[in-house]
Amino acid sequence: MKRHSILIAALVAGTMCQAQTFETKYARPLGDVLNDVAKRFNVKLKFNVDTTGLKLNYADFRVRPYSLEETFDNILKPFDFYALKQNGNLYKIKQYEYPRRQPVDGQKLIPYLASKYSDKASWEARRDTLRKEVRERLGIDALLARCSDEKPLVGKTRKYDGYTVQNFCMKTVDGHTVKGSVYTPLAKGKHPLIICPNGHFLNGRYGKVQQQRLGTLARMGAICVDFDLWGWGESEDEVGAKAHQTAEAHQMQALNGIRILDWMIKRKDVDKSRVGVNGGSGGGTQTVLLTALDDRYTAANPVVSLSSWFDGGCPCESGMPIQLSGGGTCNAEIAAMFAPKPMMLVSDGGDWTSTTPELEYPYLQRIYGFYGKTENISNVHLPKERHDFGPNKRNAVYDFFIKTFKLDASKLDESKVTIETEDQLRFYPKKK
C-alpha cells in the first residue's frame, strides 16, 4: 500500500513537471492562473468573460510579484481581456473594448494632437483632412445619394401649455423610415431650431426627462425635434432590437439627423441663423458627429459625452472607424471642428467626462483661441454628479440656449410640460 501511494505521488509529480516545461510552453488554464493571482495579491475577481478552455503559455512567468497591474496586463492581453478596478479590492475581467481607454491615454493623446497645429492655418488644414475622412469612413455620402425625397407624413397636432407636439414619419433610404416628434412654440414668428438626438437613457425619446427638456425649450421659444435611435422605439418594429448594436446604426442615426434637418430647415417658422443640436450620452456623441457632418448648425451642446479617451461604448456611436481619421483622432478633436461657433460641454465627475475641466476643455479653448473666440466655448462641470440627464444638467442646457438663441427665460418651468405616453409619441400604434 505504501509503495502504491509513493508510485501515484511520483506519477502526479512527474505529470506536473512534464506539464510545466519548455516543451509545453509552461501552459496553464487561464482560470487557474487568475485564481492564483487573486490569492497572491489579495483581490477579488468578477468575470464578464468566459475563460473555459483557455490556456496561457508561459503562465507563471508573466506574474510580476511587485505589480498587480503589470501582472494583469501580461496575463490578459493575449486574450484581448483587461481588468477594470471596481470598488475596494474588486476587479472586473472584461473583453477588450476598442472605444474605451483610460484617462492617462487621453492625457497623452491630447498633447499629441495639439502638437499638430500651432495656429489657425495649420489647424484648418488638419480640420479639413478630418472632415473629409470622417465622411468617407462613415460612408455617409453614398447613403445620402440614395435617400428618398418624399415629403414626411405628419400626425395630428396636440396642444399644451405654450407649445404643441406633432409626430412624423420620414422615408430615408432603402425603404427605411425614421419616426420622431416635433415640439413647437405656440408663439408666432421665426424660431430657432434644435435637433435633439437622444442617448441610451430610460425609455429613449419617450422618457420623462427627454420630454421635459424638449417641452421646456419649446415653451421658451425653440422648435425641437427628436427621433428614435436605430433599433429602438418604432425603429425596433422595423429593423429589430439587434440592429442597434451594429455599425449600420452608426450610419443610420447620422443619416436620420441630417435628413430631419433637411426637412425642418425649410419650414417658414424656422430661423436658419439659429440652428442648434443637443443630446446627452450617446445623443451627445451624435451631437458632435452631426456638427462635423453638417455646417448648418450654429450652436452645439453635447451633454455627459465628450471625451478624449472614450469614443462611445455602443456600435451606434463607434461602429464605423471614424476615430482612425487623420491617422487617429478622438471626439474632442472632432468637436473642435465646430470652432469658432458656440459650444457648451456639460460634464460630471462620475463618468468619462470627469477629465473635461482640465483636459478636453482647455484643449478646445486653445482651438477657439485661434479665432479669437474663446468666449464661445464653455464648460459646466458637476463634479459630484454621475452619468445622467438630471435637473442640473438640463438647467445648464436651458441657460446655454437662452443665452445663445435669445430664448424667453421667463417661460422656464418644467412643471408646465405635459408628459405623454409612448403611444401618444409613436406615429403608429405599438404592436400588441
Predicted features along the sequence, with ranges:
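Bacterial Sec-dependent N-terminal signal peptides
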Residues: 1-23
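Mobile cap/lid helix-loop segments that gate and shape the active-site cleft of serine hydrolases
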Residues: 297-336, 341, 348-361, 370-373
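Alpha/beta-hydrolase fold nucleophile elbow
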Residues: 269-281
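N-terminal export/assembly leaders
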Residues: 19-98
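Glycine-rich nucleophile elbow surrounding the catalytic serine of serine-hydrolase chemistry
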Residues: 279-291
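Cap/lid segment of the alpha/beta-hydrolase catalytic domain
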Residues: 189-269, 305-316
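Alpha/beta-hydrolase-fold serine-hydrolase catalytic core, especially in secreted/extracellular enzymes
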Residues: 65, 96-177, 347-432
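Proline/glycine-enriched tight loop/beta-turn segments at coil->beta junctions
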Residues: 160, 175-178, 185-194, 200
